């Protein structure tokens, strides 16, 4: 639950709005990216909705409500598939073009979007994520 809560609280609320600005600015430099950028921006809303559904399933389970396993599995699969596809598409199609085309003024516009420190990985990380952060560090060490 902590991972999904984090994903709903930070990337969906602070990171994606900044990407939306960057993608809109990118289109001003290369009109051929219009459809790709529009899709990635739309995916932000779809990912948020899928994350909310998964979080709702997890909250019901924690509250003792019995739900079908297939319901939870479908919600988790939907969220993960959308998110993985979205990240891969951004990294493949847009990040290289953004590095190439966006100007200092564009990045300033992106930076103007309000944000908060990352509660999981930031210097002032949120206490509720301490155990999660430790688990991620252990998994990273084991993967090496």
Regions found by a protein language model. Name each.
Residues 1-144:
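Small-residue-biased structural context
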